[in-house]
């Protein structure tokens, strides 16, 4: 039984457009909604989906042609008698509307469009854009293009005719224009259209039109090409210009010269531009079928059999066809007896060259066996839909019939020709419940989307519905074996660069292989490799500054060498990010991460809020809420802010004064304050979405749209104008201020009286709040105006798009004004443009009426007015630099100031310091400076809540602002990740949330009323405008509960569902995370974070900068946190990052902290590592099988019968074949069922043993705390509430371990960790004695305890003959369930012991250090567990070693676990302890298990302090370490070295680390793949030993008979060494410590030894680690010494050695013999296989590996 690998898919409902008028007739209503379509055109562009046209009737079409369509229409209306009377023309039932789906909010919108009548194009005169169906649509450069389709005949309203019109919709103007109606172009429908050279600025953008039918239902075989720049049809113009070459430029859809037909319903085509040939190529899905087999079981007379008849008549030259069922093979004419019957693929490649011939691709040789049923489905898909993603074609289709349950998804890897099955089952419901009909690729988010309907409506896929979507992740594309058979390896024959139009392209010459080591093709923004060539192919000789910068960009932002990894941003954006990080990082930073090592890493808040998103906002809001709560309830005092009700009572004089934080950086780039802010700045991307104009429901969206035009989304670039059209205009009552214009605010500087430092409230614009500079210089300014939080409105004549504010708080609108100004006071507009974005501005105080208010000021005011504010100087002198103050170092991107046009305006966020100082506040925190009195409390009634258009109503503006040549014209950031639907969880108004908080009290008291909770629901729109009916329809997807409310800045205290306030209760981030995950479009953080908190349009009080958090403690190493911060700058995976701990840490951080794009990018890398492991296992299997076959052939004297009999009877050979089949199954997308069954059984036994084994474990005094529950076992240190003071503990988030606060603090964990049982380490006396007791007790503890404590290395290599020879060792796995259980038990014990060790106090650590240093010699001589292990080996294989952790912890070579403060990080959150890894590698090195270079530790394993190298990688960036040496550490274990094409497969403990990390992030697919690789590696090690033993036995027999042992051409010395090693007694190693040196039996290890022998055998490296712990300087010296050797010799020599293709077979094969976590075969026989593979694989074409990687140019 085959089981698919776990799915990564999630389903989401979509909000369909709302009917603008319920009284519309049925035909019109269906046009204006998306209930159903037939023949609509669908296209995904950036982060949205467009749908246009189509019949509004559900027609189940088995065949799509005009005749069949009209028949179905007649039948449909014949059944609908009530519609016959209303039927006038078919045009009534064809929609002309275009709809847009925002993938972020998952909401459909209808776009109101018009016909461009002002165009100079004569084609538009008198024309109307008619309804159509079965047309094609594409998107490029802010335009939508539509070609062809069926229209209603102008002469007959009942007839449909094809058209050849090409229309363009300009999304800027939303106007349709006809750009071509060339009669020479064939009319067609049911075709496809692609955009060529969209991202290549050096080539003209062209439209490629493929397939379809003409007016007579005859297939159109010609490909038409339209040049968008010249507006000419190239497919016709060239032949017209040159009659002699007429027809020469035509491109026909063909296979080997035989024309074929393509129809959109039966085939699909994708355009591949980034191939090695640099020739755009179409990949067509065109399956082969027998002539008598109709497409869908229909009559043979259908048109769809036409193409297959052609194909069956075509004769493939030079190949003979064979049939197996419906699958076709061809056999080469080569006389090679080993020629493989190759299955022909349904994928056809067709280069876009004149008269080029298409070629059908072949399938991967590993999938050619006729028993392989996986190929039956993708070769016979019905209603196929496909798309292209990074050298893979993702395909969905139905087989054997179009039932929803028969929908299959496959991935076709172009490089290897392999088909991989993908599980797309919905995790929340059965797949049969959903019906999907269309596949889309969301490239920016690495997601595949399936569009359809939630419930099965029993319609065929021709019926299109749009209410449900399924997404699944695409990083798994890296996780499959892509080895290509050497027979099909491409040759660099120059055809790719030849422009000979008549060349017949061979099958593999134009495969879209990855191109060069720079992998520029992986970046969707980079142009093709010919970007420096013009159309003539001549390199450009000119070099401009732009081209130089582009070259520099590509040089500095080289992605990882992975064929399926794409960058998020274009290179220039990443360069800007890198420069900002490395050059201006400190200058820009106003926030810092505090790492577990105590280091500080600066980063701008603006950047974090933009690209981290709502999770960071929640952290900020919680931190701000905690601070304000402490000020309010605990009376905490501060030097900056003091609580003085007396002072506050004097502040009423300037009650109208306001503070707002309208910190849009775009204002700086506005040419003047009144100009529209459409600036093309890199800070505001053209495709950025303004979340400030948002509502949370389609109801509000419809309301707001109707004010402009019915159901019309706002596509204008000025996204704020839409808000100004919908905001209700409110007067301000007794303020006496008339709203005559826009009142955009300038910030108010907050100045500390003691130091004069300017605490900058985020700056704003001052529109009508103008005050002349000369006048203002004579007026007093004040640091902080204390007033009720203002609410502003934006008038319709305001041009600035970043300053409109929405509010739902019970406040009135007030205009901003400066001190002593009236409504006509002004300040020079130039300030808004000359001021730097980072400059603090002078504080402006709003006077009530006239300048005379200054003269009436209180004495405090007058005293203060005599002081000139330093902020004034910033206005007067635009060249003034930033002040070195607390506030100025916190840049404009403060918590509230970092806003842009696409996020909320900060004047919605009030500063707590001011709001808390309102009258009637119980405690009034005010600045410790003289403050004026406050205004009287206004008594006017509260205005109604203004409503505004949807948050994403302007999202289409991201498509329309800039052309291709704009530097910001790239698609929106993939960090613009998904947020939960705006209608899901934002139904509780913020005003109700704030009811009992300090701010809400102030607000209610200010206006003399306290609004009841229920009233707030009704009056202030808790349901956000959703009516009862709508709520009822969507109750499945969202409910009103506090857990559904995202934490917001103003959320100071939590409320329960009844609105009751619980003192000290805050929103739980954990529940917030868990509840949000269910409805997001993939556990995604929304970088437009503030928008997500503001999408409910409720008021958000301004933040007080003095209370704003400015640092965040992150319990991770400095290296990990630095990489974490770097990602926000560059949005790229840095190849220099270490796999452990950095990358694995980042995976967990991305999951916990909700950064999904980071998660996707890291999983891509991890899948690539897994695939390299599986490739290595496959190569090892092939090598073993071929080696065994050669030996058997010699042994049987080439007698075929004897050879077959011998192979069939060889158990080891058959078992190896089983492993090969298992690897093939895994690579095809299935789970190995036998491994799965054994693993699940072992796990269940393990859980049963947990509670019972506790006493027994403690009996041995191992110091392992009892863990009795599955939850604690599955969740390691960090989440199980481990030692509070350890670096890894979540509880240490608030206090670094060196803060001295250990026992008195309470945990501030976001996850509320469970209480941990007391560690048994508290009663430990001496770890050395414990080790001795443990080893002494082992023989008497019985077999059960042996199994529990020694399973990890209970390999069978010590046995001469396996005690349990079993087929595939599966029975052995079954019989070793207790061993398997104890494997996991041991891992659990390691984690628990690491927790407890980290809980040691300094006294015990110092005692242990002293004792260990005193007992060093004795320990080396007598107490070495390694020696004890050696003496026990012959007695019992399970006693191969003592408990790994005990040995690692207490052995003299790794005793630093107790003595190094950095070793608390050794386990790194689920990763294997690095001391243990180091020990295993030392053994591996000494016994030479394999020739592979361990990517993590082989280099440093000879250095006793190597655990510091990686286990505590952050050591190198501790303040007292040499930071310059950091780059020298990361070479071997860096990602670029682990995933490069020539990298060696990872050793098993690397897989183990990935597996443990995948458990932490609960990634079932990643867990399954890694666990399978680990288990198969273990089994393969045992089988390798058995195979080599069988070979050795055959060699002995052959010696006795005098036969030659080695076949001609084999490397007999190497093989003989391997064979002799099998019988080598292990006693040679029993009494010797594993020397830290390389054995000299392998050429690879020899070469490596030469490069590293200087430090591997240096005397200093033999110093005991105990001395290095007590003397840190010595350790530093050793590391520096190693670094010098490492950087100068090792990297170069090993790179040169292993990049040599001659070494690749053996290098690959060695990757499976690595030291591994639970069952290592540390046999010296392992290297035999390496040498045999050296001898055999080089001579055997069938297994020569890596042609895909090795043939890179």
UniProtKB/Swiss-Prot annotation:
<feature type="compositionally biased region" description="Low complexity">
    <location>
        <begin position="979"/>
        <end position="988"/>
    </location>
</feature>
<feature type="region of interest" description="Disordered">
    <location>
        <begin position="1604"/>
        <end position="1686"/>
    </location>
</feature>
<feature type="compositionally biased region" description="Polar residues">
    <location>
        <begin position="1653"/>
        <end position="1677"/>
    </location>
</feature>
<feature type="region of interest" description="Disordered">
    <location>
        <begin position="875"/>
        <end position="915"/>
    </location>
</feature>
<feature type="modified residue" description="Phosphoserine">
    <location>
        <position position="1664"/>
    </location>
</feature>
<feature type="compositionally biased region" description="Polar residues">
    <location>
        <begin position="690"/>
        <end position="699"/>
    </location>
</feature>
<feature type="region of interest" description="Disordered">
    <location>
        <begin position="938"/>
        <end position="957"/>
    </location>
</feature>
<feature type="compositionally biased region" description="Basic and acidic residues">
    <location>
        <begin position="1399"/>
        <end position="1430"/>
    </location>
</feature>
<feature type="repeat" description="Kelch 2">
    <location>
        <begin position="206"/>
        <end position="253"/>
    </location>
</feature>
<feature type="compositionally biased region" description="Basic and acidic residues">
    <location>
        <begin position="1711"/>
        <end position="1723"/>
    </location>
</feature>
<feature type="region of interest" description="Disordered">
    <location>
        <begin position="1706"/>
        <end position="1753"/>
    </location>
</feature>
<comment type="function">
    <text>Negatively regulates early sporulation-specific genes. Seems to exert its function by positively regulating the Ras/cAMP pathway. Required for growth under alkaline conditions. Acts synergetically with MDS3.</text>
</comment>
<feature type="region of interest" description="Disordered">
    <location>
        <begin position="1312"/>
        <end position="1467"/>
    </location>
</feature>
<keyword id="KW-0469">Meiosis</keyword>
<protein>
    <recommendedName>
        <fullName>Negative regulator of sporulation PMD1</fullName>
    </recommendedName>
</protein>
<dbReference type="InterPro" id="IPR056737">
    <property type="entry name" value="Beta-prop_ATRN-MKLN-like"/>
</dbReference>
<keyword id="KW-0597">Phosphoprotein</keyword>
<feature type="compositionally biased region" description="Polar residues">
    <location>
        <begin position="1344"/>
        <end position="1379"/>
    </location>
</feature>
<feature type="modified residue" description="Phosphothreonine">
    <location>
        <position position="298"/>
    </location>
</feature>
<dbReference type="GO" id="GO:0030437">
    <property type="term" value="P:ascospore formation"/>
</dbReference>
<feature type="compositionally biased region" description="Pro residues">
    <location>
        <begin position="938"/>
        <end position="947"/>
    </location>
</feature>
<feature type="modified residue" description="Phosphoserine">
    <location>
        <position position="1356"/>
    </location>
</feature>
<dbReference type="GO" id="GO:0004601">
    <property type="term" value="F:peroxidase activity"/>
</dbReference>
<feature type="repeat" description="Kelch 1">
    <location>
        <begin position="143"/>
        <end position="198"/>
    </location>
</feature>
<keyword id="KW-0749">Sporulation</keyword>
<dbReference type="GO" id="GO:0005829">
    <property type="term" value="C:cytosol"/>
</dbReference>
<feature type="modified residue" description="Phosphoserine">
    <location>
        <position position="1307"/>
    </location>
</feature>
<dbReference type="GO" id="GO:0045454">
    <property type="term" value="P:cell redox homeostasis"/>
</dbReference>
<feature type="compositionally biased region" description="Polar residues">
    <location>
        <begin position="774"/>
        <end position="783"/>
    </location>
</feature>
<feature type="compositionally biased region" description="Low complexity">
    <location>
        <begin position="880"/>
        <end position="900"/>
    </location>
</feature>
<feature type="compositionally biased region" description="Polar residues">
    <location>
        <begin position="797"/>
        <end position="807"/>
    </location>
</feature>
<dbReference type="InterPro" id="IPR015915">
    <property type="entry name" value="Kelch-typ_b-propeller"/>
</dbReference>
<feature type="compositionally biased region" description="Low complexity">
    <location>
        <begin position="670"/>
        <end position="683"/>
    </location>
</feature>
<dbReference type="GO" id="GO:0005737">
    <property type="term" value="C:cytoplasm"/>
</dbReference>
<feature type="modified residue" description="Phosphoserine">
    <location>
        <position position="838"/>
    </location>
</feature>
<feature type="region of interest" description="Disordered">
    <location>
        <begin position="962"/>
        <end position="988"/>
    </location>
</feature>
<keyword id="KW-0880">Kelch repeat</keyword>
<feature type="region of interest" description="Disordered">
    <location>
        <begin position="771"/>
        <end position="807"/>
    </location>
</feature>
<feature type="compositionally biased region" description="Polar residues">
    <location>
        <begin position="651"/>
        <end position="664"/>
    </location>
</feature>
<keyword id="KW-0963">Cytoplasm</keyword>
<keyword id="KW-0677">Repeat</keyword>
<dbReference type="Pfam" id="PF24981">
    <property type="entry name" value="Beta-prop_ATRN-LZTR1"/>
</dbReference>
